[in-house]
Amino acid sequence: KYKLVILSHDDPHDPNETWILIRDKAQALGLKVLLAEFVGTYTKKTPDGKRFIHSFGLDKEGKVIMPSAKNKNVEYAKPFEIDPSDTLIMARGIGTSAKSGNRSWGDMCKVFEYEGYTVINSTECHNICNDKWMNNLIFKRENFNTPKTVRINHPEGAKWALEELDADFPLILKTAAGSRGIGVMWIESEKALHGLVQLLYREDEYIDILIQEYIKTDYDVRVIVCAGKILGAIKRPIVDGDFRSNVSQGSEPELHELTEIEASESIRAADAVGGLLTGVDFIPAKNREKDKPYFIEVNSTPGLMGIESTLSGAAAKPLGKKLKKEGTSITT
């Protein structure tokens, strides 16, 4: 029986709804599934060479039961045996060491990679996708259509960056690390940009700041790609009174039928970052049938709740089948 281990971090601002969805679909297809919260989870080998994952247990709602000042006697769940020949590892919410403050999560996944496990997604893929500047470099290298983007390297770098960008206001300012539209700002003048850059550097001297040309649009598109196949796509309208389209910011997703060029370029974008399961975000071209869309970023831990409800359950089931297929291919 093939196994799926889902390693994730249950952030109050990014709840673990997706891992419950994936677990249920995978179990329905006959996979044995372990949900493990990154915090507190560790792995070790026994003297006879067998590897186990040790993690805290879950309650009936899938919430991790962790020790606290009021609940000090929480024990680890029964160790879960894994083997490269029959186990898939899915790492969600791994972030980067700068973002999470914890290198051990990525290091644990590297152990699995070194030992031959199929890890969805790889640590390299996570590192690329959790850095918007690295996303941009990959897009440029692989000849994707993407908004012009420049990195600001120091507190007084706004003027140089504007000259390098060579784009009209308004502009978009982003921090290199961030999700759900957080850290994305609308800039209307050089004075506003200069002041904001100085403020951000005052708060964090190691921050990475990007400025990007603004592509006017009524919506952007999120495409879920799994192992080279498209599971579904949604249109995310711009939020009223805002310029962002994240579902977490209030955008209400709708079905989106991809053109041939949108579909092929989305698959190519997922492949460019080495992703097995990704969310690819783009702004459509004016002539969608002929021109390439503007790619914004690839997400290595895409949430599936918004797209699953919009597609009426049409995304998670094929995902489960893909995971099962990946599992059966482990031994071939």
Task: Describe each PLM feature range.
Residues 3, 87-88, 294:
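Structural motif
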Residues 171, 232, 278, 294-297:
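Protein kinase-like catalytic core scaffold
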Residues 208, 213, 243-295, 317, ...:
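A long amphipathic alpha-helix within ATP-dependent nucleotide-binding catalytic cores
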